[in-house]
Amino acid sequence: MLGNYSSATEFFLLGFPGSQEVCRILFATFFLLYAVTVMGNVVIIITVCVDKCLQSPIYFFLGHLCVLEILITSTAVPFMLWGLLLPSTQIMSLTACAAQLYLYLSLGTLELALMGVMAVDRYVAVCNPLRYNIIMNSSTFIWVIIVSWVLGFLSEIWPVYATFQLTFCKSSVLDHFYCDRGQLLKVSCEDTLFREFILFLMAVFIIIGSLIPTIVSYTYIISTNLKIPSASGWRKSFSTCASHFTYVVIGYGSCLFLYVKPKQTQAAEYNRVVSLLVLVVTPFLNPFIFTLRNDKFIQAFGDGMKHCYKLLKN
């Protein structure tokens, strides 16, 4: 029966509704956020790589997290900006749409895994400080990163393949600023109920699976902190986890709102807002969350700026 339908070979993305003036304001806002996101995360990556004081597992993981933030936001934001500037050009081929969705989901899965790894790292640092260098040695965290990258990209092969095995004949218009899976399911002329349920279960498995080590780690961290008699000691212990905990709340919260829902094809406005939180706001906040209250990083960054100034002066 599906043979009578012709599937779309390209999609037109509606992006953001509104007048040309509104689009220009959105373009200026998102371009500024994107530029600050890239520059801020690049600064962290360079500082972590060149400063010997930051050669520890947590900063190694932070550097990888910054790389991921740049890659994740770059999967959709440049195309979104182009669409705001020239709305009539928001056309994407089926192959490009599949590639964008695959990269976005794979990098997102990898980011969740990395957040879980960083939580375990904080657990070891707080609860087993004397064994930290033994447990989190160089070979351990390098293998953890390799496994995370491999699993991140392998885990999303079937979900994306299953999505693009559908026939998209209801419409070639996606009411979003990137190739959102919910919108793709919405324009399919096939019954997607079972497929949506399987995708929902996989999203639950990935998100909750990476959330478990985070919850367990912070349970032990809080338990250990409560045993510290002095308030200053408690604050010092928790300060090592505060930035990561803040990032976890924002990251997992937005992912749960966006993906862990039985019905993937819910309101486009809702998906657009939460997608902006994942693709624009969180990557933008990342450099500030991890560095503003980190005295060690601020010192390293200051030393680096002084060194650059001396080189330029000479």
From Swiss-Prot:
PROSITE patterns noted in UniProt: G_PROTEIN_RECEP_F1_1, G_PROTEIN_RECEP_F1_2
GO molecular function, one term: G protein-coupled receptor activity
Compartments where located: Cell membrane
Glycan attachment sites: 4
Record bears the keyword Cell membrane: yes
Spans within the Extracellular topological domain: 1-24, 86-99, 162-196, 261-271
Keyword terms of this UniProt record: Cell membrane, Disulfide bond, G-protein coupled receptor, Glycoprotein, Membrane, Olfaction, Receptor, Sensory transduction, Transducer, Transmembrane, Transmembrane helix
Annotated TM spans: 25-45, 65-85, 100-120, 141-161, 197-217, 240-260, 272-292
Topology in membrane: Multi-pass membrane protein
UniProt xrefs under Pfam families: 7tm_4
The keyword Glycoprotein appears for this protein: yes
GO terms under cellular component: plasma membrane
Residue spans, topological domain Cytoplasmic: 46-64, 121-140, 218-239, 293-314
Domain of life (superkingdom): Eukaryota
Disulfide linkage: 97-179
PANTHER family membership: OLFACTORY RECEPTOR, OLFACTORY RECEPTOR 6V1
Role according to the record: Odorant receptor.
Protein family: Belongs to the G-protein coupled receptor 1 family.
Protein name: Olfactory receptor 9A1
Organism: Homo sapiens (Human)
Gene that specifies this protein: OR9A1P
